[in-house]
């Protein structure tokens, strides 16, 4: 994924290259003559560069594709440290002590010196962050198959046309296939495991618990694994539920895992949530248990075919609004080899055009996957983050990065994806009014260079970026 997750808007902003004589835009993409697909012949070596991202706006997953142990790292967009917490003086970034003359002193310095080093200004107006927090991984869903032996015919791919990732290979004379998608209509991540021989599927299903969740507990019952607890940092309540349905064979609790034995096919659904609510000043809502349970119950009651069909129909309702024709032709090279060959003169022009079209439509795919109504907007990493403390907190930089996420929304006919951004801006007004009054003695509202889901509208102490009181107008 590299930093496509940070700047995917730039990809789609170049939807119609200027001056290319064969560029054409179509709004009817029911039957694509050239399929859009990322594909590789080996498992992902690392999360950022090679993992395959799936998402439904609120949740995201990254598929690794290892033969013996499949890993799906997953996120839920409201799982954030920081914000209000018992014993924490969280002021939304507003000054923790009155500074009645700070603005006047800063203005005098600028008037007197014209060019002022940012350090003294930061000392007057900035302060260290308290409770800013970070977006965090929810954990990993792992499928442990044991040693299947040497694999052949290995393919790992992401079907951009239908928003489905897959892994297929042959081992021990058995052809295995796994499919993965994130369903917006059903609110779950879905995994399907099949084999071409009856009773060939036996594996353990487990979920990891990252650090900073000392009271998290696993509960297993029937074919369901529940992980619930609170973040140590702020007490945020979280819960995920995994439901495993085996066709043929059996599934049963086995210590801390669910064990599938002798199955023909297996469907796994995963939902997650927290008690976060975008409401100032507490930013808390109901315990997620009832909501997560209802979501998993409803999805588990459906067949895999029903879940898959609903997902594809929902996704293509958005994605199929735009088709880009640059005269491209489908190359036979895996995507990593295609990237390496691009611009070297070894590809035909039509094959290079294919990569350009794929790159553009991948940007639209990432926006659809990371921003849908009903959750927070896409952050610095969309909806995908591997760690518990991510670069820049995977926050919302409102100087330009947040806006960049949504550059493709209107111009590539994905206006609905911007609704979370509009609602997020509206929610910033309440804490922003307090910042305007306490810091400037002014009406209206303000937000500075960056913010988080907890209404951080004040300042920090990085001299190069702490002061940007007109950011709300820039939004």
Pin down the residues of each PLM region.
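Secretory targeting and sorting signals
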Residues: 1-24
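Short, surface-exposed loop and linker segments with low hydrophobicity and enrichment for Pro/Ser/Thr
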Residues: 3, 260-262, 472
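Aromatic-residue-lined binding/catalytic grooves and analogous aromatic/hydrophobic interfacial grooves
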Residues: 25-463
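Extended, hydrophobic alpha-helical segments in both membrane/secreted and soluble proteins
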Residues: 401, 468-475
């Amino acid at each position: 994924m590299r930093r496509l997750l940070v700047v995917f808007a730039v990809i789609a902003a170049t939807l119609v290259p200027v001056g290319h004589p064969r560029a054409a835009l179509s709004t009817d993409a029911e039957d694509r003559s050239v399929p859009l697909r990322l594909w590789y012949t080996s498992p992902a070596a690392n999360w950022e560069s090679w993992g395959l991202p799936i998402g439904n706006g609120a949740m995201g997953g990254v598929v690794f594709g290892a033969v013996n142990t499949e890993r799906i790292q997953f996120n839920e967009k409201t799982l954030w440290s920081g914000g209000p917490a018992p014993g924490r003086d969280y002021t939304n970034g507003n000054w923790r002590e009155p500074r009645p003359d700070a603005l006047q002193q800063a203005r005098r310095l600028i008037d007197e010196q014209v060019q002022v080093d940012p350090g003294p200004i930061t000392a007057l107006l900035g302060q260290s962050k308290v409770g800013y927090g970070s977006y965090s991984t929810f954990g990993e869903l792992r499928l442990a198959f044991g040693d299947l032996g040497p694999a052949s015919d290995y393919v790992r791919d992401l079907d951009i046309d239908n928003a489905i990732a897959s892994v297929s290979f042959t081992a021990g004379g058995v052809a295995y296939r796994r499919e993965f998608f994130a369903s917006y209509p059903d609110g779950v991540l879905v995994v399907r495991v099949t084999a071409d021989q009856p009773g060939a599927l036996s594996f353990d299903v487990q979920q990891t618990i990252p650090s900073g969740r000392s009271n998290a507990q696993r509960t297993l019952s029937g074919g369901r694994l529940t992980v619930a607890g609170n973040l140590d940092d702020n007490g945020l309540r979280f819960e995920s539920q995994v439901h495993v349905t085996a066709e043929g064979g059996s599934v049963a609790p086995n210590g801390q895992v669910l064990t599938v034995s002798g199955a023909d096919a297996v469907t796994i659904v995963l939902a997650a949530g927290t008690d976060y609510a975008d409401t100032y000043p507490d930013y808390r809502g109901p315990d997620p248990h009832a909501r997560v349970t209802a979501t998993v119950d409803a999805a588990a009651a459906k067949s895999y075919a029903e879940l898959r069909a609903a997902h594809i129909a929902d996704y293509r309702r958005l994605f199929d609004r735009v088709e880009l024709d640059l005269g491209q032709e489908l190359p036979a090279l895996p995507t990593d080899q295609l990237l390496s060959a691009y611009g070297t003169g070894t590809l035909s022009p039509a094959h290079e055009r294919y990569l350009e079209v794929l790159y553009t439509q991948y940007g639209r795919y990432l926006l659809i996957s990371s921003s849908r109504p009903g959750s927070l907007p896409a952050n610095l990493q969309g909806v995908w983050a591997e760690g518990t403390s991510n670069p820049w907190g995977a926050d919302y930089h409102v100087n330009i990065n947040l806006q960049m996420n949504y550059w493709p929304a209107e111009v590539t006919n994905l206006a609905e994806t911007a609704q979370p951004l509009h609602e997020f801006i509206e929610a910033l007004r309440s804490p922003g009014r307090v910042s305007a009054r306490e810091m400037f003695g002014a009406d209206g509202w303000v937000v500075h260079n960056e913010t988080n889901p907890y209404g951080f509208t004040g300042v920090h102490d990085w001299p190069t970026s702490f002061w940007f009181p007109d950011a709300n107008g820039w939004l």
